[in-house]
Amino acid sequence: MVRCIKGLKGIKGAGALILAFSLTFAYPAVSWAVETEASEGTVTYGPGSYVVGEDILPGEYAVFTEDTSEQNAYSTCTITLYKDDTDARRIGTFQFQHHGLISLYKGQHLVITKGYAVEADRAGITPGTTGMYKAGRDMEPGTYRITPLTSGSGYYALYNDVRYYYDYIDEYAALFEPVTVNIANGQYLELFDAGSIERVPD
């Protein structure tokens, strides 16, 4: 699923900013719930190469699939993040179902291979069966029951940060049957091939 991607050099500075603004309408930021939309005036960063602090501001971003079909909850987006623009130190290549979340820091190099990015606080994310969610912003903290789409096909993961992902993972499990998960305020939930998620009494 995850593959190494070399940088797509060439979209820097003003060119990246122009591309970002031009893609605002080409790639409307929609969440899993179709009635939710990104805040008006949100800048959208399409496929390309971005140096954080030059081409894109530091901060937390949501990366969405470009698929706008009714089945887009199960479509993917792919990004690669490097520690700097030399590409010598790759943090990782990440693929998300529908959308993922990532924190970007000044000097890092982001390559969006498939999908587009918007500021997470302006992305209008609402809970769904795939993607990533921050408790306290995108969903309510609490206890949830997660049911797989089909037995063994999916997984869930909890993170305390979205900088380097696996260094900050709190919990991970494959979905063979319904599971109950407690999600604390500020934690991040990732869902892949879940069939349903519902709030249950704590």
Regions flagged by a language model, labelled:
Residues 16-26:
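Bacterial N-terminal signal peptides
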Residues 116-132:
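A short "linker-to-beta-strand initiation" element
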Residues 24-41:
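Sec-dependent signal peptide cleavage junction
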Residues 51, 88-104, 134, 165-184, ...:
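Beta-sandwich interaction modules
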Residues 1-9:
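N-terminal secretory signal peptides that target proteins for export/translocation
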Residues 101-114, 181-193:
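Noncatalytic modules at the cell exterior or secretory-pathway interfaces
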Residues 46-48, 52-60, 131, 135, ...:
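A glycine-anchored, Pro-Gly-centered beta-turn/N-cap motif
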Residues 67-85, 151-163:
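Short, surface-exposed beta-strand/strand-loop-strand elements in extracellular ectodomains
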